[in-house]
């Protein structure tokens, strides 16, 4: 299994020492200061390199949609993958604005997207209905994890030093809610939200599906991998693999919202040291995301009321991180500027 690369604590300490002598009152840049120091630890440099983000969107369908859990039909997954390929989705606009590498990976789209200029790593055409049976077999789960690992390797080989995973899959908030409930012990009423905007009847269907799925595995002693197979989805497993491989290679991941956090929880059961390589981007408007973040011991940078997925919330936060690094590297020290430091 994966083993996360150790942090370079000497580089982090050197970065903190630099922060202490920059021309500003100590701590006056707030979280931006420690963010820069975290990148120092991740990169092994007291003055980290500018950030080169890579965004990978994993797409798959979910059998649980037959339970009436989504406001949109499953065909939307295929249609949105076409939209990604054509550059018309929100994450495409954000990637262009950030000059970020963007890759779309089909790990389980039910429709035919074989002619599109994306990465084709389809494990199967959608997961099974998790309310009635295991969403994936153990072999399918491992194949999806490996698709995510391979995507992380491609991104890093292309020069990325910051990873963002996005998701596309009608029904995936239901799978994510089931995972978060199982892994945290939280009640479905606290975790299951409206996702793509279901009405009250749809919300009741989602809660019923999650409760049925949880009851199906209630007496089983499941490992993290088993839980992912029983209650997850192909793109969720791929995102987990993406995070794990990034950490093994020494590249941090900026975690998006509800689905990405469910994947991170699963990945953390596989490698607890993964925590050191994750950074939460935003607090989603989706019910239960706060519970997932608490379980991950991650603190989001912003709360903009977003709940789109695709990696969009994480992408919006990339400029904050880029500015944190630029401030750290570009500001003068008191000695360099000829400015008097704090009086003894």
From Swiss-Prot:
SUPFAM superfamilies: Nicotinate mononucleotide:5,6-dimethylbenzimidazole phosphoribosyltransferase (CobT). Signal peptide: none annotated. Its EC number is 2.4.2.21. It catalyses: 5,6-dimethylbenzimidazole + nicotinate beta-D-ribonucleotide = alpha-ribazole 5'-phosphate + nicotinate + H(+). InterPro entries: Nict_dMeBzImd_PRibTrfase, Nict_dMeBzImd_PRibTrfase_bact, Nict_dMeBzImd_PRibTrfase_N, Nict_dMeBzImd_PRibTrfase_sf. The active site is at residue 310. Pfam families: DBI_PRT. This is Nicotinate-nucleotide--dimethylbenzimidazole phosphoribosyltransferase. It comes from Chromobacterium violaceum (strain ATCC 12472 / DSM 30191 / JCM 1249 / CCUG 213 / NBRC 12614 / NCIMB 9131 / NCTC 9757 / MK). The gene is cobT.
């Amino acid at each position: 299994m994966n083993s996360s690369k150790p942090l370079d604590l000497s580089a982090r300490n050197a970065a903190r020492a630099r922060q202490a002598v920059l021309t500003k009152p100590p701590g006056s840049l707030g979280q931006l200061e420690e963010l820069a120091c975290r990148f120092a630890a991740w990169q092994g440099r007291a003055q980290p390199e500018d950030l080169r983000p890579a965004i990978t969107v994993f797409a798959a369908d979910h059998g649980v949609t037959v339970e009436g859990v989504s406001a949109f039909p499953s065909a939307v997954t295929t249609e949105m993958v076409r939209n990604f390929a054509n550059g018309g989705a929100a994450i495409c606009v954000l990637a262009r604005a950030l000059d970020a590498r963007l890759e779309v990976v089909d790990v389980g789209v039910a429709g035919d997207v074989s002619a599109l200029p994306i990465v084709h790593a389809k494990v199967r055409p959608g997961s099974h209905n998790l309310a009635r049976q295991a969403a994936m077999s153990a072999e399918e789960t491992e194949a999806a994890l490996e698709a995510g690992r391979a995507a992380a390797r491609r991104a890093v080989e292309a020069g990325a030093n910051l990873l963002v995973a996005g998701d596309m899959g009608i029904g995936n908030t239901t799978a994510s809610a089931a995972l978060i409930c199982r892994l945290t012990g939280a009640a479905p009423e606290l975790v299951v939200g409206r996702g793509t905007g279901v009405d009250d009847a749809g919300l009741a269907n989602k809660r019923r599906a999650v409760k049925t799925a949880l009851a199906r595995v209630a007496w089983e002693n499941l490992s993290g991998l088993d839980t992912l197979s029983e209650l997850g989805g192909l793109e969720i497993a791929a995102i987990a693999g993406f995070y794990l491989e990034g950490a093994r290679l020494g590249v941090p991941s900026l975690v998006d919202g509800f689905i990405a956090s469910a994947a991170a929880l699963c990945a953390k059961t596989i490698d607890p040291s993964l925590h050191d390589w994750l950074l939460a981007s935003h607090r989603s408007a989706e019910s239960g995301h706060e519970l997932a973040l608490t379980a991950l011991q991650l603190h989001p940078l912003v709360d903009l009321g977003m709940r789109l997925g695709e990696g969009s919330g994480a992408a919006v936060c990339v400029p904050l991180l880029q500015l944190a690094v630029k401030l750290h590297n570009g500001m003068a020290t008191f000695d360099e500027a000829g400015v008097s430091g704090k009086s003894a």
